């Protein structure tokens, strides 16, 4: 019996020891996890600081060489736009590939730039949502007539009219403005070439021995046309509006409230409208300041419905479609000229004034620091010798 009791006591002690060792191991592991997490967070903070310092350094260097960079950008922009116009006439079937290349290269670069400027919520706007759908259509479903009509409605509806209404400016010395114009202008040109000018599309869509069509897709059924050019695009737009509201006004609400420098489309529009005290600002305040955002959503919905309805006659008429392309390009060029002749001179004057105000304290300190020392007078020399 005594041996059994000793054995049970030993087993209890061993069980307690094993429990303590397991407990200690768990504590050690939790400590290691906490230490690793702290180390990774410190490394992330250090990496972020290094990247921000590098970004500031690059921005300062860009400011120092601003004129040269603007000249290079203007040269490349003019040559690129001229090459695009040549390609549009010589090989219209290659325009969709040019658009895909542009989107894949410049939209990620814009996200990096906008992230640094705290403008990255602009990339949740409808134009980027629609351009992503365009990319899916062109790369994955190029022969899907229904998806083509939805994309056509977006490209020649809200995106095209935003180019005119929001006064996008074709300024070749500004990469940001060029990209903004092309995001709204290129999709319409892409779907124009596919519908009216693309010989490869026509050859693929016409069986041998049948009469050639004048356009693709050929739609004779008016209800079908109304459904895929207006109703379905409106449903897709509503889906975007719901997602945008959930992300910006629900999920990221506290983040935006903490940092007023982070810009969204609503913040930019409200600031500009309030500063100008225009009709948009007055109409948005009909239901009170607390409901301005809902009024902006309503205005955008009305704008979208109206512009999508206009895509139906544009889709059916080649001449009307050509006139609309000329109107869009003319508006972008006109706004660019207005920017160069009216806005840019004011910006240059403001920059010069800012430089002068920054240089004034330095110039005031220079005479005091480098003032020439006069030789001591006879009285001063005697006083120094006496002491």
Curated annotation (Swiss-Prot):
EC number, as in UniProt: 2.3.1.-
GO molecular function: glycero-3-phosphocholine acyltransferase activity
Cytoplasmic side: 1-67, 115-120, 167-173, 249-295, 341-387
Topology class, membrane: Multi-pass membrane protein
Region (Disordered) location: 352-387
Keywords, comma-separated and alphabetical: Acyltransferase, Lipid biosynthesis, Lipid metabolism, Membrane, Phospholipid biosynthesis, Phospholipid metabolism, Transferase, Transmembrane, Transmembrane helix
UniProt enzyme class: transferase
Entry's localization field: Membrane
Catalytic activity of the protein: sn-glycerol 3-phosphocholine + an acyl-CoA = a 1-acyl-sn-glycero-3-phosphocholine + CoA; sn-glycero-3-phosphoethanolamine + an acyl-CoA = a monoacyl-sn-glycero-3-phosphoethanolamine + CoA
Lumenal-facing ranges: 89-93, 142-145, 195-227, 317-319
Disulfide bonds listed in the record: none
Name this polypeptide is given: Glycerophosphocholine acyltransferase 1
Protein's organism: Brassica napus (Rape)
Gene name in the database record: GPC1
